[in-house]
Amino acid sequence: MSKEAFDELSVLSAIYCEQGEFEVLEESPEKGVVFRVHTLIDNNEKTPLDIIFHISPEYPNTPPDISISSNHLSRRQCHDLRRSLLDTAQSLPAEPMVHGLMLWLQENFSDLIKTSSCHSAEVRPETTEETWTALLHLDHMRSKAKYIKLIEKWTLELRLTGRLFTGKLILILLQGTKENIKQYIHLLKSVKVDVDSSGKRCKEKMMSVLCEIPKPEDKIMMTTFEVKDILSLDDLRREFDLIGLNELYHQFVSSLT
């Protein structure tokens, strides 16, 4: 960790000093630092946000990766907040920026939420339907950019959250209603999503459903769908740990390696 990053973490831990406000989740010379900030945003009422920052060893020359979740916001709103923070981070000079991003979010939160709400009628998915978790394994992606674009489009339309992990293993982790997950799997099998070895468009014929189960009540619901380019199996395991699904990893993923 650079001295700049270390100094910034010290400042952040001093600012967010109440219990549960600041937590370092992971730290290594190779991967950098992953930490969580829990904050309350004043917007007529207090909105709790959990923001996870991943600062790489190249930080601040490389902006942090960011995840946002909140029980008071919809998946679309969390997605839009994350996108706005990432865009802002890209526009800033190469210097410590996390505290500045937190201040920017506080100042612009109301406008960002209004804009997001205009794009989507939902404010918070109020549903009594049971939330399910599904884990899919893909053999390959030849037309990766187009494939990912379709995956993101369908998860947004079907109000599914989760992760797409690309790398040695290609996994799609989904959370949502059972009906919407079934519809997603149907789309994946019936629409031409990739190309074959000759470059001709083709349907997904080598996808396997590793599991499709009700989400345990004690597990946190993911509020966004994010694409993660995972270079190592250790990184993949840590990603499952971060979202509280390490049991899922050990039960269904470790046997694939």
Swiss-Prot record:
Annotated ranges, domain RWD: 7-113
Keyword Cytoplasm: yes
Top-rank taxon: Eukaryota
GO biological process: one example: positive regulation of protein sumoylation
Pfam family membership, one: RWD
CDD domains, sorted: RWD_RWDD3, RWDD3_C
Localisation per UniProt entry: Nucleus; Cytoplasm
InterPro entries: RWD_dom, RWDD3, UBQ-conjugating_enzyme/RWD
Keyword flag Nucleus: yes
PROSITE patterns, sorted: RWD
Entry keywords, A to Z: Cytoplasm, Nucleus
CC annotations in GO: cytoplasm; nucleus
Record function comment: Enhancer of SUMO conjugation. Increases SUMO conjugation to proteins by promoting the: binding of E1 and E2 enzymes, thioester linkage between SUMO and ube2i/ubc9 and transfer of SUMO to specific target proteins which include hif1a, pias, nfkbia, nr3c1 and top1. Has no effect on ubiquitination.
Domain comment quoted from the record: The RWD domain is required for the sumoylation enhancement activity.
Protein name: RWD domain-containing protein 3
Species whose genome carries this gene: Danio rerio
